[in-house]
Amino acid sequence: MRKESIFGGKIVTLYELYAHVFEVGAKSVENMKFTLEHKAPSSKARAGLIQTDHGPIQTPIFMPVGTAAAMKGIFHRDLKEEAKAQIILANTYHLYLRPGMDIIEKAGGVHRFSTWDGPMLTDSGGFQVFSLSDCRKLKEEGCHFRSHIDGSKHLFTPESVIDTERTIGADIMMAFDECPPGDAPYDYAAKSLALTER
């Protein structure tokens, strides 16, 4: 589905976007709310507040990357108190392959698994899958790829990635996107965007 057909060109809130795109009544989506708090009079800069089940996020914000749902070399307490982190990013591709969804699910989701009690965003893993150019095949149904860990075969589809992110228990989930190289021709980049927006 193209963006224009979904929203008719109007600007939507983060809540509306997630509620529509994922077509779910997931608790984290129902309770998510974005409030625009400040707009700069002379530029497009703005500040806001995103409410999630795991706490508020002031925007703009520094978001540390904990690829496997853990920050290396720093305790969560210090991450919050010293670095003032309000949200961390975890990667769906890496969590899917190791430790795997069975372990994440048995732990009660990524927050319990990692002991991070604040908001968490999951990247779809699209960049990682598409960077495996020798180990992946893009088809209409999704992307077939081989694990960089053990060579096992997998298929990521937009639906399977969202299901995986739901199992992870992220507060904010990124859609599975094709990530063309920075020097990709315009036509290829436009085709990639259309594929992501469907």
Where are these regions (language model features)?
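Short hydrophobic alpha-helical segments enriched in small aliphatic residues
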Residues: 8, 16-23
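Short, basic/low-complexity N-terminal boundary segments at the transition from targeting/disordered tails
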Residues: 14, 22, 29-35
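Non-catalytic, usually N-terminal nucleic-acid engagement modules in DNA/RNA processing proteins
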Residues: 31-198
